[in-house]
From Swiss-Prot:
The chain crosses the membrane at residues 274-294, 528-548, 572-592, 609-629. This is Macrolide export ATP-binding/permease protein MacB. Belongs to the ABC transporter superfamily. Macrolide exporter (TC 3.A.1.122) family. Non-canonical ABC transporter that contains transmembrane domains (TMD), which form a pore in the inner membrane, and an ATP-binding domain (NBD), which is responsible for energy generation. Confers resistance against macrolides. PANTHER family: MACROLIDE EXPORT ATP-BINDING_PERMEASE PROTEIN MACB, MEMBRANE COMPONENT OF TRANSPORTER-RELATED.
Length: 646
């Protein structure tokens, strides 16, 4: 027979290692097979025939010798080049069928074409045509578990033909079939040979081997005999390697098909997928909720500081090494008058505060009394009743005052108008001349409405018996010069008191400190919530490792039909990313819902796109990071080893 052989094996050896033990399975196999031959390789169990088949089909590599396929030295090819060679040249028919259990008959047949980059419509049409030709047209949507052994083997044959199957390698194709089904399979193989396929059957049964034109018998890893049983009829036109699409379209198809296969695999074990999703959902929803609550708390604090005014400077008595600022008696109302003379000062309000006992009728109530001057009520605190609001009432120790809404509700539970009425403050009758606008909770959670405001002189002498003040609140004209004004106030008071006995802060710096503290708290809350996301990521990795272990044979089938390492890597990474993306999306929705529920319950919540995007991105990154190791493990499997797994 003229021409170079399609397959040439030269002194092929194969050794397996088990620890320090080396076992040589093939011993110097030399063999030629020409295109279009129908060859049977026969041997008993342990003879090395399956190992030889794995080497012939590029599922495994020899330890020594040369393997030339169509004149190309296969030993020089890397894993992905071998995958391409398998995809373009070989079709495999296995004894155990090796169909993907979660896929339909048509989807199983399409697998080789997926990795060849064949467009979806074209491969569906070809798969249906092959199954129709094998009398399985009414079983396209059936899964392997719904089919008989003979039907499954015919699906395996259709899959072998999907990319052309220039060389058909059939490993014990009738071993798991009844006699009639086995006869049908052998007739199909004979028909494929007559159509130009090179058919190599691996078998232990002589009656099967006798159906081939050439019988090669192997024993103990060596060729025992090579017999041509009849005149070899080589078809006039043998098949050529399968052509594939290339370029960007192929890469896009790779990703698209990987996404479809990933979602298909996730649906196949929905309960486990849901359990895996829960970890990501809980993690993402926790991050979104905690960041929303943390941002809301930060915004609340800043809003309250802004409500107090960022143009304010607070002067308090303080001295290094001296405890109890309220006991320092050097800050006096005259200091406020001096501060008012500074160029950028709009107002300077001295204030004295203390706890007092209020009484009306038989109701006693403890509240906070603030003694201040007219600027306090006219510039900082809004009053509902101004008809009695005259500066003269701040002088001459007049016993009058304004009540906060909390005090009004406590002392006047009937809802009557308190203006003009009298109450006792520290057993001294005071006339109520106004009420204060509600302020709500203050910085630190204090009730700003639990207060009674009285003239400064009245508070100092009648209520607290002192001449000094507790603080001076300064309002500036230009907030951009607040730091300069603060320094001027400090210098003025140091000069007046002959020593440094005051502490001065401005609300702008307080706001900055509060903002920094709020960010720290938000980060802390987010970090605590992120721990649950990390746990969810570990769950993804565990499930993916289990999935790789369970689907090892499926991985082998995909590799045998032409999947490259990157195809397997991409599929399992996308499975992990799909879990994380779906869980992340659900987690974001639930997190926003939980934040809305918290807002409805009265908590301050801050919504922004950033934390939501961050949580989703973290979930996506979690899937990528924790899915990579299982995916890499899957892609590193040897096809022959994966196919032999249980």
């Amino acid at each position: 027979m003229a021409g170079a052989p399609l397959i040439r094996l030269e002194d092929i050896c194969k050794t397996f290692h088990n620890g320090d033990l080396a076992v040589e399975v093939l011993h110097g196999i030399t063999l030629d097979i020409r295109a279009g031959e129908f060859v049977a390789i026969m041997g008993a169990s342990g003879s090395g025939k399956s190992t030889l088949m794995n080497i012939l089909g590029c599922l495994d590599t020899p330890t020594g010798g040369r393997y030339l396929l169509d004149g190309e030295d296969v030993s020089t090819l890397n894993a992905d080049e071998l995958a391409t060679l398998r995809r373009r040249t070989f079709g495999f028919v296995f004894q155990s069928y090796n169909l993907i259990p979660t896929s339909t008959a048509q989807e199983n047949v399409e697998v080789p074409a997926i990795y060849a980059g064949t467009p979806a419509a074209e491969r569906r049409k070809r798969a249906a045509a092959l199954l129709n030709a094998l009398k399985l047209g009414d079983r396209l949507d059936h899964r392997p578990s719904q089919l008989s052994g003979g039907q499954q083997q015919r699906i395996s044959i259709a899959r072998a033909l999907m990319n052309g199957g220039r060389i058909i390698l059939a490993d014990e194709p009738t071993g798991a079939l009844d006699s009639q089904s086995g006869e049908d399979v052998m007739e199909l193989l004979r028909s494929m040979h007559q159509q130009g396929h090179t058919v190599i059957v691996i078998t232990h049964a002589r009656e099967v081997a006798e159906r081939a034109d050439r019988l090669i018998e192997i024993r103990d890893g060596q060729i025992l005999s090579d017999t041509t049983k009849r005149d070899i009829h080589t078809p006039e036109a043998t098949l050529q390697p399968h052509e594939e699409i290339a370029g960007n379209g192929a890469h896009i198809a790779d990703i698209s098909e990987a996404v479809k296969m990933a979602l298909h695999a996730l649906r196949a074990n929905i309960f486990r997928t849901v359990l895996t999703l829960l970890g990501i959902i809980i993690g993402v929803s926790s991050v979104v909720t905690m960041l929303a609550i943390g941002t809301g708390a930060q915004n609340t604090i800043l809003d309250r500081i802004n409500a107090m005014g960022t143009d304010l400077i607070l002067v308090r008595p303080a001295m290094a090494g001296f405890r109890g600022s309220g006991s320092i008696a050097t800050l006096v109302p005259q200091d406020a008058d001096a501060i008012l003379e500074l160029p950028n000062v709009k107002s300077a309000v001295p204030e004295v505060t203390g706890t007092v006992t209020l009484r009306r009728g038989n109701v006693d109530y403890q509240s906070q009394a603030n003694g201040t001057v007219p600027a306090f009520s006219s510039e900082i605190v809004e009053s509902r009743q101004r008809q009695l609001h005259h500066p003269e009432r701040y002088r001459y120790l007049r016993p009058c005052g304004w009540l906060g809404t909390t005090v009004v509700k406590t002392l006047f539970p009937d809802g009557g108008n308190p203006v003009g009425d009298y109450i006792l403050i520290q057993k001294i009758p005071f006339q109520i001349i106004g009420t204060l606008e509600p302020k709500g909770a203050g910085f630190g959670g204090s009730d700003q409405d639990d207060v009674v405001v009285v003239p400064l002189s009245t508070g100092n002498l009648r209520l607290f018996g002192q001449k000094y003040v507790r603080s001076i609140t300064v309002q500036v004209k230009d907030s951009s010069l607040i730091d300069t004004t603060q320094n001027q106030i400090q210098s003025l008071l140091d000069q007046r008191h002959k020593k440094r006995d005051t502490m001065i802060t401005n609300m702008s710096s307080v706001r900055e400190d509060a903002a920094a503290m709020g960010k720290t708290m938000t980060v802390f809350l987010g970090s605590v919530a992120a721990i649950s996301l990390l746990v969810g990521g570990i769950g993804v990795m565990n499930i993916m490792l289990v999935s790789v272990t369970e689907r090892t044979r499926e991985i082998g089938v995909r590799m045998a039909t032409g999947a490259r390492r990157r195809d397997i890597l991409l599929q399992f990474i996308i499975e992990a990313l799909s879990v994380s993306a779906i869980g992340g999306a659900i987690g974001v929705i639930l997190g926003l819902g939980a934040a809305a529920l918290a807002s409805w319950a009265g908590l301050s919540v801050g919504y922004s796109f950033g934390p939501v995007l961050l949580a989703f991105a973290c979930a996506f990154a979690t899937g990528l990071i924790f899915g990579f190791l299982p995916a890499r493990k899957a892609s590193r499997l040897l096809p022959a080893v994966a196919l032999s797994s249980e």
